[in-house]
Amino acid sequence: GKPVLLDFTGFGCVNCRKMEGAVWTNAEVAEKLNNDYILISLYVDDKTPLKEPIKVKRPDGTTRTLRTVGDKWSYLEESKFGYLAQPFYVTVDNHGNPLSGSFVYKEDIPGYLDFLNKGIENYKK
């Protein structure tokens, strides 16, 4: 198996496109994304309606109603990883457990490679 890279992104996320253009196009990064990870991009602004609304409790104790696919992904990002901005990247194992912390918007190829490599190393342990 392979570790998963969760990419919390948005259709209207300018910084997400900048990361994809400046970091993901690097040959070494692209090789890792294509060969060493299962990449799952979750669009927090996806307006596709859910079949039925879902009421959830937020980390701060308030209640929220999820009505769209994007609502579901933003709730996952906030409730599981404690973050609510894009881009947000986290490597996880097959049970959804984080492997190497997280990475946010920073056009830093060596830093991003380090983040990806730590995820792979921890996955193999």
Indicate residue ranges for each PLM-predicted region:
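Thiol-based oxidoreductase modules, predominantly thioredoxin-like and allied folds used
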Residues: 9-12, 18-71
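Short pre-active-site segment immediately N-terminal to redox-active cysteine/selenocysteine motifs
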Residues: 1-4, 9-15, 85
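Non-catalytic, surface beta->alpha helical segment in thiol-disulfide oxidoreductase systems
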Residues: 21-29, 58-125
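A short beta-strand-turn-helix
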Residues: 1-4, 33, 78
